[in-house]
């Protein structure tokens, strides 16, 4: 069986087709979008989700390159294959720039397109040059112009919450995009991609008829790989991965789903796999955190700290669309940034209340976020040996040895420098929540309600359920006494598993576990 070639890091449709690399057919979406009543479209998706490839596919389509689409869905749908002049601007190279640098970068982008149309004396100002470029392409070709802008928001993402710098860059980009309104009669199609929506930009404030398809059911699967697409086009890959991992086909599909599936971009969205992680997994035949480790931005972690996001609150939540599918530069909560960046996704929708259920998409995101946040509680030493300690704890708990796991935790915390923020019990609750959540295959929750109070931590393993209560500068027996006094265990009597009660006491002077007591 010939090995399948994966287009990892390749975002050019023509190259993928000519080199016979794997291409997940999205051309039906292309036809649908280009043959409706709209002219201006915007799509928001997380990084490395196939936005650039979609833009490249649109470019090849509008350039009339019919031969590239043989065997794809659009071949049977399109009958004309009209060639249009296409202006393609990739803004991803405009990151980390001051205003003057950004102006020069826009100039370089325009210059590349101007050369194609023989414009030797460009006008001053990027917006004037874009107007001139559209006019020239329209007049010389005799056809309306297609404008494709990839990662329109890239120049502003890193300064989204630095008002002075953001205002300067936003004004520059507003001026650049303004011709998209003034030249409307000369435009056949305008498509912009990005990660987030920035308010007060011309594309949203001036293009009143722009169609935002980011949460449209009809386009929910336009980027990424659905389960149906994976099973139909990557069946052999699944079998090869299963063989390499010594798993059954069903176990392999379940593992892929747990790690990389779980994205939903509308109320009726199909399950969508992260394409970057899925392709890397098939290529390496290893289950790794490919997407998370490829570029989780520092500013995201910093913003989570700024908004005092408790790790335990990163899970299931309810929200209206206006609170997460919203501009991020003036946000008062972290939810829009987490959703639009791909760290939260839609898990459910209630038509009556119009409330969406949001949650972490999958295991890759959950583990990656918690590993990134744990150094906040452990003064940075986690990166050196915390992952090893947690893996060893996971093995011990799998064998029902909570005493051994807590002894190992005590030893590990003894190697961590003293942390100043250790004078409240909630700090330790969040730290233990992260650590227990990183243990392989267990369900962890905090502040679980019972008829007589709230349990600090509840952990469900394959063989038993742990009811855990914490104390600070007291003693473990007091923690266990609270579990028994308030009969917390009764709340879980019907879980079908043995229940183990654990009282843990922390010492604020050392930042470590002082003592613990375990009762079956």
Locate predicted features.
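Phosphate-binding site recognition
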Residues: 1-424, 440
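Structural motif
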Residues: 146, 464-466, 500
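Mg2+/Mn2+-dependent nuclease catalytic core
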Residues: 166-171, 472-489
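Active-site metal-binding core of divalent-cation-utilizing nuclease and nuclease-like domains
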Residues: 136-141, 435-462
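Domain-level recognition of nuclease-like catalytic cores that cleave nucleotide substrates
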Residues: 491, 495-520
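Conserved catalytic cores of phosphodiester-cleaving nucleases, focusing on short active-site segments
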Residues: 432, 455-472, 486
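Metal-dependent nuclease catalytic cores in nucleic-acid-processing enzymes
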Residues: 176-183, 336-344, 433-437, 482-502
């Amino acid at each position: 069986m010939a090995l399948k070639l994966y287009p990892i890091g390749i975002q050019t449709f023509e190259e993928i087709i000519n080199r016979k690399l794997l291409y997940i057919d999205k051309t039906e979406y292309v036809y649908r979008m280009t043959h409706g009543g709209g002219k201006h479209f915007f799509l928001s998706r997380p990084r490395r989700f196939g936005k650039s490839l979609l833009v490249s596919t649109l470019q090849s389509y509008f350039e009339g390159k019919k031969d590239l689409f043989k065997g794809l869905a659009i071949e049977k749908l399109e009958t004309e294959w009209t060639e249009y002049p296409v202006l393609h601007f990739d803004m991803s190279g405009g990151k980390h720039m001051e205003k003057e640098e950004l102006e020069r970068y826009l100039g370089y982008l325009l210059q590349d397109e101007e050369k194609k149309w023989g414009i030797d004396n460009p006008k001053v100002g990027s917006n004037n040059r874009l107007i001139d470029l559209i006019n020239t392409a329209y007049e010389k070709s005799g056809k309306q112009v297609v404008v494709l802008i990839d990662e329109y928001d890239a120049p502003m993402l890193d300064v989204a919450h630095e008002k002075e710098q953001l205002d300067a860059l936003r004004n520059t980009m507003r001026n650049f995009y303004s011709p998209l309104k003034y030249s409307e009669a000369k435009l056949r199609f305008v498509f912009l991609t990005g990660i987030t929506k920035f308010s007060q930009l011309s594309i949203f404030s001036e293009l009143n008829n722009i169609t935002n398809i980011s949460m449209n059911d009809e386009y929910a699967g336009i980027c990424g790989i659905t389960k149906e697409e994976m099973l139909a086009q990557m069946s052999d890959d699944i079998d090869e991965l299963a063989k390499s991992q010594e798993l059954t086909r069903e176990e392999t599909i379940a593992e892929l789903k747990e790690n990389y599936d779980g994205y939903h971009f509308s109320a009726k969205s199909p399950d969508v796999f992260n394409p970057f992680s899925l392709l890397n997994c098939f290529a390496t035949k290893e289950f790794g955190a490919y997407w998370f480790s490829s570029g989780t931005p520092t500013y995201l972690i910093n913003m989570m700290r700024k908004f005092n996001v408790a790790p335990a609150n990163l899970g299931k939540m309810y929200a209206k669309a206006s609170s997460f599918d919203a501009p991020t530069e003036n946000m008062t909560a972290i939810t829009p940034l987490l959703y639009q960046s791909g760290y939260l996704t839609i898990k459910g929708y209630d038509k009556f209340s119009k409330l969406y259920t949001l949650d972490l998409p999958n295991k890759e995101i959950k583990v990656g976020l918690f590993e990134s946040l744990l150094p906040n509680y452990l003064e940075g030493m986690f990166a050196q040996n915390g992952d090893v300690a947690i893996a060893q704890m996971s093995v011990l708990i799998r064998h029902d040895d909570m005493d051994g796991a807590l002894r190992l935790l005590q030893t590990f915390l003894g190697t961590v420098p003293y942390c100043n923020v250790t004078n409240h019990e909630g700090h330790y609750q969040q730290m233990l929540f992260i650590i227990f959540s990183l243990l392989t295959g267990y369900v962890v929750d905090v502040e679980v309600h019972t008829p007589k109070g709230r349990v600090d931590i509840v952990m469900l393993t394959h063989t038993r359920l742990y009811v855990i209560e914490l104390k600070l500068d007291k003693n473990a027996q007091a923690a266990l006494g609270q579990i028994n006094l308030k009969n917390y265990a009764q709340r879980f009597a019907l879980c079908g598993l043995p229940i183990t009660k654990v009282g843990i006491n922390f010492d604020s002077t050392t930042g470590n576990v002082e003592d613990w007591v375990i009762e079956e």
